[in-house]
Amino acid sequence: MSNCELTVLKPAEVKLSPRDREGIINPMYDCQPAGAQYAGIGIKDCIPLVHGGQGCTMFVRLLFAQHFKENFDVASTSLHEESAVFGGAKRVEEGVLVLARRYPNLRVIPIITTCSTEVIGDDIEGSIRVCNRALEAEFPDRKIYLAPVHTPSFKGSHVTGYAECVKSVFKTITDAHGKGQPSGKLNVFPGWVNPGDVVLLKRYFKEMDVEANIYMDTEDFDSPMLPNKSIETHGRTTVEDIADSANALATLSLARYEGNTTGELLQKTFAVPNALVNTPYGIKNTDDMLRKIAEVTGKEIPESLVRERGIALDALADLAHMFFANKKVAIFGHPDLVLGLAQFCMEVELEPVLLLIGDDQGNKYKKDPRIEELKNTAHFDIEIVHNADLWELEKRINAGLQLDLIMGHSKGRYVAIEANIPMVRVGFPTFDRAGLYRKPSIGYQGAMELGEMIANAMFAHMEYTRNKEWILNTW
């Protein structure tokens, strides 16, 4: 008989739980009005009007300027004590008329509530009816769409605020235009992604010979001042694009929490089929997206994308087993990003042991198939904390959690610096590394970019800490 023993590996555990305290320490997500403003600035000839204090606009615009290195026009009703007591309806009505007079090309105004205006109970829909009558009287030859966006800051996050604004603007405009002739186009809701991701998606659709409208089209967030470019608004999604969404062949929702509700609205109201697929982080998710596009449109996946896939696979294979295998990773940010990056990490042999999701939609996460997929494929334990903050990350590191890499936005950089752990910047906002908003994180090209960013962060850390840096001489 042999003396060898049989080791039985315990099954991996994926634990999903909320933050274990009421107070927030070092928040990792923004409020609902911030997300609503981001959706608004993606629309051409649109200026969001935030019904609240000036800080609800000023600090969000600062975040946009830090991330994109561009200025964005967002208006505020500048709520003060008097309005908090007697109501702020007059501030809304005055703000809408001032915007209409100041911006002759203005066509859309999302009216975004805040915690203060939701608490005092301002009737936004009633104010919009009053504003519409005033606009018709003063500007009979112009049509300005006013969309009510209810985004109290005391619940949800920038993710739910983004989704709410997109849905409200689409409902307002499509209800006004109704159903028209079929366009044969594809509606695409990529969610909260960077301009570089939008450019990549456009290229994919062009190579597949598919006509698509991407909502919201942020490509011009990074573009020169050209003669036909608006100096007030940077978004490329037009009112006509939004109205035409009711006539589309189908909707492709690439973000479960950041646009899928609008796809469901179009399906329910105008019978436009809605196909929900995972945000295309990594190879498999990109494969699934392209297959779905081919299935819906009848187009073939071109050789150019097959070649790009092969290049990405080759680049990632050069890194995965030698440098990434068994490396522990913590990821924080909004849910579609975090779960998508976790799937990508699994593809390249990284181990996403801690996922921090800055949102309070706990019941929805329990039904997310990506979490079930992680349970079925991981050979290591994973902890997922929703409604999280950055203290949840710092606390676990201080308690002894061994990490080789942190992935998240720039607000978490001091945690990585203090713990001497390499960090890759992804998500929003990223302002301490140059030009990240221009680079894609999705698709085959994005997978290759992410893999190389991770590798280079690890390589730099090996050199600065003199930890087996000699390996880089022989690689």
From Swiss-Prot:
List, alphabetically, the SUPFAM superfamilies matched: Helical backbone' metal receptor
List the Pfam families.
Oxidored_nitro (PF00148)
Is Ion transport a UniProt keyword of this protein? no
User: What keywords tag this UniProt record?
Assistant: ATP-binding, Iron, Iron-sulfur, Metal-binding, Nitrogen fixation, Nucleotide-binding, Oxidoreductase
Single GO BP term = nitrogen fixation
Cofactor(s) the protein requires to work: [8Fe-7S] cluster
Instruction: State how the cofactor is bound.
Output: Binds 1 [8Fe-7S] cluster per heterodimer.
* Enzyme class (EC, first level): oxidoreductase
A molecular function (GO) term: nitrogenase activity
Which EC number(s) are documented for this chain? 1.18.6.1
What positions does the entry give for [8Fe-7S] cluster binding? Answer: 31, 56, 115, 153
Please verify whether the record's keywords include rRNA-binding.
no
Reaction catalysis annotation: N2 + 8 reduced [2Fe-2S]-[ferredoxin] + 16 ATP + 16 H2O = H2 + 8 oxidized [2Fe-2S]-[ferredoxin] + 2 NH4(+) + 16 ADP + 16 phosphate + 6 H(+)
Q: By its UniProt entry, which InterPro entries does this protein fall under?
A: ChlB/BchB/BchZ (IPR050152), Nase/OxRdtase_comp1 (IPR000510), Nase_comp1_CS (IPR000318), Nase_VnfK (IPR014281)
| Organism domain of life | Bacteria
Q: Which GO terms describe its cellular component?
A: vanadium-iron nitrogenase complex
Q: What does this protein do?
A: This vanadium-iron protein is part of the nitrogenase complex that catalyzes the key enzymatic reactions in nitrogen fixation.
Q: Which family does it belong to?
A: Belongs to the NifD/NifK/NifE/NifN family.
What quaternary structure, including any partners, is listed in this protein's UniProt entry? Hexamer of two alpha, two beta, and two delta chains.
Q: What is this protein called?
A: Nitrogenase vanadium-iron protein beta chain
Question: What gene name does this entry carry?
Answer: vnfK
